[in-house]
């Protein structure tokens, strides 16, 4: 069954299939990611505030180290929130067929899966009043991709992670 103009579950499954697995994601190398980004994100926020004068009224940034599937899930939630008003309006005038919802899901799933293999992090500021605040205003770090880039270019992990933050 479809959930309107986009079959969100199909998009999620396709994206995860395209994303694949990064071998380093299950290694001991990932153990320090959570600790490092918990320390470096507030540190980077202070450096930016000192340099620009920009200070968040909402408090300190919240960091979350996730895998590719987590990044896909977060972005599907964001797309659903962002597109909800447009899709609701469209549904009343142009009801979606099963075929169009599958095509939309395939397009979205392929793009998100491809992007999940390349993105290192993301600041998600999509705020809506009717959603859980713990799901919004986050800095995501895609752990497997960060580990892969560190290895590929022989970056010093601490320096690279602070730079990302």
Where in the sequence are the language-model features?
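Active-site scaffold of zinc-dependent metalloenzymes
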Residues: 113-163
């Amino acid at each position: 069954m479809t959930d309107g103009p986009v079959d969100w579950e199909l998009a999620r499954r396709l994206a995860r299939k395209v994303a694949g697995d990064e071998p380093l994601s299950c290694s001991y190398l990932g153990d320090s990611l959570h600790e490092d980004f918990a320390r470096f994100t507030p540190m980077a926020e202070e450096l930016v505030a000192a340099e620009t004068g920009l200070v968040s009224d909402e408090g300190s940034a919240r960091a979350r180290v996730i895998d590719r599937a987590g990044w896909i899930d977060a972005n599907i939630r964001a797309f659903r929130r962002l597109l909800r008003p447009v899709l609701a309006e469209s549904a009343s005038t142009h009801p979606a067929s099963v075929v169009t919802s599958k095509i939309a899901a395939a397009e979205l799933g392929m793009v998100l899966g491809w992007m999940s293999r390349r993105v290192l992090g993301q600041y998600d500021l999509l705020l809506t009043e009717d959603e859980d605040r713990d799901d919004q205003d986050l800095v995501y770090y895609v752990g497997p991709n960060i580990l892969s880039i560190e290895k590929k270019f022989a970056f010093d992990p601490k320096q690279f992670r602070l730079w990302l933050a």
